[in-house]
Regions:
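Gly/Thr-rich phosphate-binding beta-strand-loop-beta motif of the actin/hexokinase/Hsp70
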Residues: 1-26, 137-152, 195-202
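Glycine-rich phosphate-binding loop of actin/hexokinase-like ATP-binding domains
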Residues: 131-188
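Short beta-strand-loop/turn "lid" adjacent to the catalytic site in phosphate-handling enzymes
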Residues: 53-101, 110-119, 137
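Short glycine-rich, Thr/Ser-proximal phosphate-binding strand/loop in the N-terminal lobe
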Residues: 2-46, 58, 159-166
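A mobile "lid/hinge" subdomain adjacent to the ATP/sugar-phosphate binding pocket shared
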Residues: 180-216
Length: 216
C-alpha cells in the first residue's frame, strides 16, 4: 500500500485537491470550480486523471476530505452547492481505502493548536498574545463557518464545528434595520454573496442605482 493520500478541501465555489505523503507535505495541487462538475465523484475522477494516477491498484493509501457542510454518519450535503459526499462511496471509488470526511472548519480547528508564530499575521498592529486558552477559527467564503478548539488535557484538544453562518442577526439602529431587508443571518451578509448585499443596502440608502444582481 502506497503512502500517498488524497486530500481535498471542498467548498461552495471551489474544490482543491492534492497529494500528501506525510505531515506538512502537499503536492499535485489542482483547483476546480465546484459548479463546473456535476458531483464530487466527477471532480475526484477528473483530478485522478489530471495527475496521471490510477487505475493501478494500490496507488492511493487513503483520503482526507474537508467539506463545507454538516457531516453526519460519514456523509455531507454541501451547504452552498448541490454536491453530496459519502465517505463509503469515495472509499469504493478508490479501491476500498480508508476515507476521513470532516467539516471544513473542523479541519481548520484541528490545525489551530499547531500554528507557529511564523504562521500568524496580527491584525491592527496588536502584538500576538500567548495562546494558552481556547481558540476559534472563522472562515468567510461562499458561506460563513466557525470552529472552536478547546484544550481538554495537557496536549489534547477537542474541536467543535458548527453552522455559525445560520445564526440570526438583530438590528439595533434604523440603519441596520434597513440593511436587514437584504439578509437576516450572519451568512446572508458576511460571505462572498453577502458583501454584494451589504453594498446594495448602503447604495440604496444613498440613492445610488446599482445592478439588481448585487441584491440577491
Amino acid at each position: 500500500m502506497t503512502g500517498r493520500r488524497i486530500v481535498a478541501d471542498v467548498g461552495g465555489t471551489r474544490s482543491r485537491f492534492g497529494i500528501s505523503r506525510g505531515p506538512g507535505d502537499l503536492s499535485e495541487i489542482r483547483v476546480y470550480p465546484t459548479a463546473g462538475q456535476s458531483s464530487f465523484a466527477e471532480a475526484l475522477a477528473t483530478y485522478v486523471i489530471d495527475i496521471g494516477a490510477g487505475p493501478a491498484e494500490g496507488w492511493c493509501g487513503g483520503a482526507y476530505i474537508a467539506a463545507a457542510g454538516p457531516v453526519d454518519r460519514g456523509a455531507v450535503q454541501l451547504t452552498n452547492a448541490a454536491w453530496s459526499i459519502s465517505a463509503r462511496e469515495v472509499s469504493q471509488h478508490l479501491g476500498g481505502v480508508s476515507v476521513a470526511l470532516v467539516n471544513d472548519l473542523e479541519a481548520v480547528g484541528l490545525l489551530l493548536p499547531h500554528l507557529q508564530a511564523a504562521d500568524l499575521a496580527p491584525i491592527g498592529g496588536v502584538a500576538r498574545a500567548e495562546l494558552i486558552g481556547s481558540r476559534i477559527a472563522v472562515n468567510v467564503g461562499t458561506g460563513f463557518g466557525a470552529a472552536t478548539a478547546v484544550r481538554v488535557g495537557g496536549t489534547q484538544w477537542a474541536i467543535a464545528a458548527g453552522e455559525a453562518g445560520h445564526m440570526s442577526l438583530a438590528p439595533t439602529t434604523a440603519e441596520e434595520a434597513a440593511v436587514f431587508g437584504f439578509g437576516r443571518t450572519v451568512e446572508d451578509l458576511l460571505s462572498g454573496l453577502g458583501i454584494g448585499r451589504l453594498y446594495a443596502a448602503h447604495a440604496r440608502g444613498e440613492g445610488v442605482l446599482i445592478s439588481r444582481v448585487l441584491e440577491h
